[in-house]
Amino acid sequence: KRIANNGSEPISLGVLAACGLVAVVAGGILGGSGKLFAYGSTFREGYTRTPAPGVAETGPQPKEALAAYMKKGEKIFSAKCQGCHGPDAKGNGSTFPSLVGSAWANGETERFAMVILNGLEGPVSDGKTYGVMPPQGIGMTPEELAGIMTYVRNNFGNTKGDVISVEMAKAALEISAARKNAGKSVTAAELTADHVKALPGAVLDPKTMVDPMTLLPVGGKKP
């Protein structure tokens, strides 16, 4: 019988089988490591990890409400409104009305919200007579509605100086869903009869500091 040098003995099949089993188990654990080591899954809901000592917390810096809402609204206007009303919101003078100085945009907030969310059917007059406006509210979030309303009312020469808060926008979505003709465009008659009023909800001071992503107050306001 040949005697092998010390340290060069052949590995037994039992050892190889055990190593293979360990490799399979380890692979299964590491394969699910996305959840095992995921911050959102490892810690309970609502837990917030604090930054290490001496390390500044990252994230968007708070902004004044009016500026933050306007920024959000600018994106929505470019995506949903600019195609018809134009980049300057002046319309084309025939089919698409101007939003500059518009009583519809600058007037009662519930009426304005209903037009944005549901569209407008039938002739309406704002110095000139216009026809149909398609609805823009499909999939629109309260933050987006609040942003676009605030943006239009404080841009293009409009100077309302107010903020349509997320709370007010949520109320608008609820009012829209509860309409008798929910799912259909509003008419001038319906607007006059039911929606010439201010949206309910807490009024947000334009100088209140908010999270620019959620548009929710983060405490205090800029002096």
What is the meaning of each model-derived region?
Residues K1-R44:
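Extended surface/linker regions that mediate inter-domain or inter-protein docking
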Residues E45-F77, N92-T95:
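Electrostatic cytochrome c docking/interface patches
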Residues A65-N92, A105-N118:
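Sequence/structural segment immediately N-terminal to covalent heme-attachment motifs in c-type
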Residues A89, L120, R153-G157:
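Activation segment of ePK-like protein kinases, specifically the conserved APE
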Residues S98-M114, P134-A146:
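Electron-transfer interface patches adjacent to heme c in soluble/periplasmic c-type cytochromes
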Residues V124-D126:
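Short, internal strand/loop/helix patches
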Residues K128-G131, P135-I138, P142-P223:
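Flexible coil segments in periplasmic/lumen-exposed cytochrome c-class electron-transfer proteins
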